[in-house]
């Protein structure tokens, strides 16, 4: 089944895969318009949750929440987002992306309006859940609209921009949040979110994507696999998002959730393994090449948390608020945008693996620089390292996906769902896992350093004896200073851990690259 107009297109203009729009040779003004809509959709997919995540403490106070309740807001977003690609890829192959995007944006819009009218914790959770559901089609819209903006020989650049530009949303949110909150507290954040959704919805209605080739892909078993996988992955997100705050072994629901998630995911995988035309191509997913791709994607996602968990937490530990870090995040935002642009200009089939390796190397250097931080370190001392991380994050994401995409082209379009779902899960669960890992590691190391520092306080030393004689207030001040120093030392340990993982990831990527080069040379020798 094809949309009208496909048959009249030139071969190079036709959709590359079912569900992907055609790419006609538009005039430059039309290409520019498509590019603007693509950038808008890409930023809308990330800006809403970025504004909420960086302002959790303000929202927590406004809604009267405790830290555990507030942390559910970003967690719920990922709970709905993590599995959405599982259904989105087939939906757009059968019905088109535009319908799915309109449904997702419509629900998202209604949720934001309802929250602005009603307020409260339940409606805030609903907004974040709707935002996660809408983020998947918005990301795809960003890719497809930007594809229309580039000529055929530069279309890889569209992927780099579509995945790199949204990464600037978090530093931009940190940069502008203090001023936005002064205008109208947290309601201003939701008004911006509402404006972005309305603008994106209007843009995709005014400028439609070209037609696509549609195929009948849904089967009854898909509607068994998807709920099993979606609920299982959502439970994993809940555990990883809340485990450190409620503590892994103290909350009984964590063990129950993990057990249920394991049963549901295993049941879904067993069902998929025995299907003739599975939703997930598990036999391909178990090949060495695919496992290598997943390892690169997941480990790089883990080490990128050096910025969101390590540097941000360190600055909080030394008493830096949002006002003191605005210039730092301006630098990070600029570096992220620069990384997306440089990546777009240099990307090609020959350079994607080397771009990934360069990004990982930059992260390793940044972690090494940050591991020397102390109690005198302030935002200006982090400009270089955090700029490296921002640049690397924007340059790594799309080339990593393109590594898998080249395997899909060799295997067939029916494996496309497997690639997109696996990549999405590696990034979303990888982000939550890295956050849980690094925060738990930091907490454990802070306790170790605190005990060590307290153990070194000899009551016979003059300055210690003076504090002890000064009364409870002076003792409390001494304990607070020890806590602060322990946290700083613990964050240095986090940076060292990231450095070690980055080096191991770089070695793994180098091995993957050498294997890929060897395969290409072997194929060339075998060719007649």
Predicted regions and their residues:
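Cytosolic juxtamembrane N-terminal segment immediately preceding the first transmembrane helix
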Residues: 1-47, 61
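Hydrophobic transmembrane architecture of multi-pass small-molecule transporters
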Residues: 17, 405-407, 422-528
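12-transmembrane solute porter fold
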Residues: 32-47, 52-54, 67, 74, ...
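Extracellular/periplasmic helix-loop-helix junction of adjacent transmembrane segments
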Residues: 55-83, 123
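Interfacial helix-cap and linker-helix signal at transmembrane-aqueous boundaries
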Residues: 59-61, 91-92, 176-184, 240, ...
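Central cavity-lining transmembrane alpha-helices of secondary-active solute carriers
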Residues: 75-90, 139-143, 330-342
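Helix-loop-helix hairpins in multi-pass membrane proteins, especially solute transporters
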Residues: 85-224
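Hydrophobic transmembrane-helix bundles of small-molecule transporters
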Residues: 166, 178-296
């Amino acid at each position: 089944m094809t949309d009208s107009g496909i048959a009249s297109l030139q071969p190079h203009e036709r959709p590359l895969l079912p569900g992907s729009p055609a790419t006609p040779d538009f005039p430059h003004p039309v290409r520019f318009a498509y590019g603007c809509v693509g950038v808008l959709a890409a930023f809308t997919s990330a800006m809403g949750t970025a504004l909420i995540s960086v302002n959790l403490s303000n929202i927590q106070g406004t809604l009267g929440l405790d830290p555990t309740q507030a942390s559910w807001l970003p967690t719920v977003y990922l709970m709905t987002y993590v599995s959405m690609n599982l259904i989105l890829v087939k939906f757009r192959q059968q019905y088109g992306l535009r319908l799915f995007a309109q449904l997702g944006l419509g629900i998202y819009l209604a949720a934001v309006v309802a929250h602005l009218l009603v307020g409260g914790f339940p409606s805030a959770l609903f907004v974040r859940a709707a935002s996660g559901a809408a983020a998947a089609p918005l990301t795809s819209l960003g890719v497809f609209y930007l594809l229309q903006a580039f000529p055929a020989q530069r279309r890889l650049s569209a992927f780099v921009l579509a995945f790199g530009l949204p990464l600037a949303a978090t530093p931009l949110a940190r940069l502008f949040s203090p001023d936005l909150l002064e205008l109208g507290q947290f309601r201003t954040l939701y008004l911006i979110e509402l404006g972005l959704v309305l603008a994106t919805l209007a843009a995709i209605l005014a400028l439609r994507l070209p037609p696509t080739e549609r195929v009948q892909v849904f089967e009854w078993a898909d509607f068994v696999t998807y709920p099993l996988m979606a609920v299982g992955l959502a439970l994993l997100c809940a555990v990883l998002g809340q485990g450190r705050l409620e503590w892994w072994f103290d909350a009984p629901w964590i063990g129950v959730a993990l057990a249920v998630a394991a049963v549901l995911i295993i049941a879904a995988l067993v069902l998929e393994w025995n299907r003739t035309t599975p939703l997930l191509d598990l036999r391909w997913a178990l090949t060495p090449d695919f496992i290598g791709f997943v390892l690169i994607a997941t480990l790089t996602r883990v080490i990128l948390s050096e910025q969101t968990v390590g540097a941000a937490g360190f600055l909080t530990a030394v008493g830096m608020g949002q006002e003191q870090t605005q210039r730092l995040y301006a630098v990070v935002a600029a570096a992220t945008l620069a990384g997306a642009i440089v990546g777009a200009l240099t990307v090609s089939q020959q350079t994607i693996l080397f771009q990934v390796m360069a990004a990982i190397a930059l992260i390793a250097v940044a972690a090494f620089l940050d591991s020397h931080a102390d109690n005198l370190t302030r935002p200006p001392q982090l400009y270089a390292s955090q700029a490296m991380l921002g640049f690397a994050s924007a340059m790594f994401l799309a080339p990593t996906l393109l590594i898998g995409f080249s395997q899909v082209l060799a295997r067939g379009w029916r494996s496309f769902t497997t690639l997109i779902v696996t990549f999405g899960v590696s990034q979303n669960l990888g982000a939550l896992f890295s956050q849980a890992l690094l925060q738990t590691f930091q907490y454990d190391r802070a306790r170790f350093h605190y005990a060590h520092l307290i153990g070194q306080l000899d009551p016979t030393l003059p300055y210690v004896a003076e504090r002890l004689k000064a009364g409870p207030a002076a003792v409390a001040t001494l304990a607070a200073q020890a806590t602060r120093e322990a946290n700083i030392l613990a964050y240095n340990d986090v940076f060292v851990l990231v450095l070690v993982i980055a080096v191991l990831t770089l070695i793994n990527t180098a091995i993957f690259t050498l294997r890929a080069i060897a395969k290409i040379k072997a194929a060339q020798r075998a060719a007649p």
